[in-house]
Amino acid sequence: MKEMKRSRIKEPLNSTTKNIDLVKKNPETWRIIPGSIGQYTYMLDGTKLSGVFNGHGLPPDAAYDLVSYKHGNDVIVLGMGVVNARGDLRITNDPIDVGPAHEWTGDYTGQPAGYKIWLVPVANIENGKLAWHPNSFLFEKSLAR
């Protein structure tokens, strides 16, 4: 009897689902402060990022972009949503190429490269450029990898 070879399905790199908490931070100290919160549940397949963001305690009817912050004032918009009357927000994004991971300094010095994920008001983004108003942003607690 002829032995059959088993074919293996190639799994995407980093194909497991992971979570990143997004929080308010003091822009002078970068310490976490009380306020709105969120969580991004994501998958990273090479440089393609997909996932679901759920936020709470946000201003009702406010429009937000979920972004991958690159450098300077460059961002890639992952998705957009409007906060409901209870202050909750859900944004889902299909796989988007976010380019190569970046090696960050500050809190991330010496750590493997990754992606910063932020929630920012839609009014703060124009043509992929970010207007810096950090008091209205939610910032990542850890990098997407």
Give each language-model segment a name:
Residues 1-145:
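N-terminal targeting/export leaders
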